């Protein structure tokens, strides 16, 4: 017997990708989607950073940018949910259309540009979830980024940690989206050192006796020398973990020409091999000392 997704997939794929995403969020918020059958087994539990993950499968940032459906996402069986990317001030992101998909190659290209309702709205949504009587088990991550026209990135990241850090189980510093001008420049050694020092200091000031772990989300398009430099910098700074990877600017030959011509970051199946390779590289470069969350092409 076909499942719910099998029945509605043709309708979903007839809609514009971003519209389909928004309709999915509304359905989750309203409880229209049927509950998923989930299995909790101690064999799947992962203990890390003093946190207990019910299982190692999480929902990556980008799905729930404004922390609207954290509860429903946990009820789908995820061991952790990473909400965001959130920016301090509200911003619309880039003009639509800005999300494109190619079902045959299981690929998506986006140039969203951090659309966000801002940290005040995000905090309000988080409070509603955290205050709920029936909060499901799981680990809550918050992915933070800078506003498009911010010339001093550390100010945005520290403001976000100040407001949202005490509410997070872990925080992800997003410096790898290809759709915000200048963001990937923060992966260079000196800007990265400066930023990490600022966020580490703000965490110490704002997050009390049990500060959330800080993770850095990186791009898959880094050259070998860049990877070595970043690994060294992250270890020096005392960051708690790495997320690999964000979307890629590469365009494999397998992609249709008109689809490949769209600007933005590529995700989906074509990213899998590249993302997996850079995970292995950073594991070696850090000597296995830092936990790595793998994302991209799953």
Where does each model-flagged region fall?
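Conserved, mostly hydrophobic/aromatic
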Residues: 16, 59, 81, 122, ...
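Active-site glycine- and acidic-residue-rich loops that bind
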Residues: 146-158, 185, 191, 215-236
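Active-site-adjacent beta->alpha loops and helix N-cap segments on the catalytic face
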Residues: 39, 89-98, 119-121, 179-212, ...
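Short beta-strand/loop segments at the ligand-binding rim of alpha/beta enzyme cores
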Residues: 52-58, 135-144, 204-222, 284-294
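Catalytic cores of alpha/beta
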Residues: 66-75, 158-159, 222-236, 284-288, ...
């Amino acid at each position: 017997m076909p499942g719910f997704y099998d029945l509605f997939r043709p309708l979903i794929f007839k809609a514009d990708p971003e519209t389909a995403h928004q309709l999915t969020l509304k359905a989750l918020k309203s409880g229209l989607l049927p509950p998923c059958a989930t299995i909790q087994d101690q064999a799947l539990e992962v203990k890390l950073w003093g946190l207990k993950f019910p299982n190692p499968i999480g929902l990556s940032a980008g799905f729930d940018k404004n922390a609207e459906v954290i509860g429903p996402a946990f009820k789908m069986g995820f061991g952790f949910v990473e909400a965001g990317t959130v920016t301090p001030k509200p911003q619309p992101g880039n003009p639509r259309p800005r999300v494109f998909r190619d079902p045959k190659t299981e690929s998506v290209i986006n140039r969203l540009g951090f659309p966000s309702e801002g940290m005040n709205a995000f905090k309000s949504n988080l409070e509603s979830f955290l205050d709920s009587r029936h909060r499901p088990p799981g680990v809550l991550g918050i992915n933070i980024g800078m506003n498009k026209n911010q010339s001093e990135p550390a100010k945005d990241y520290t403001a976000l940690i100040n407001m949202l850090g005490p509410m997070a189980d872990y925080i992800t510093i997003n410096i790898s989206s290809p759709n915000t001008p200048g963001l990937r420049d923060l992966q260079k050694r000196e800007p990265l050192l400066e930023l990490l020092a600022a966020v580490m200091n703000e965490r110490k000031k704002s997050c009390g006796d049990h500060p959330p772990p800080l993770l850095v989300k990186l791009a898959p398009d880094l050259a070998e020398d860049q990877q070595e430099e970043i690994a060294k910098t992250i270890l020096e700074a005392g960051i708690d973990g790495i997320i690999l990877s964000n979307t890629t600017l590469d365009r494999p030959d397998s992609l249709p020409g008109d689809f490949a011509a769209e600007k933005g970051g590529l995700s989906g199946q074509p990213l899998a091999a590249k993302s997996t390779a850079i995970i292995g590289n950073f594991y070696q470069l850090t000597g296995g000392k830092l936990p790595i969350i793998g994302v991209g092409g799953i």
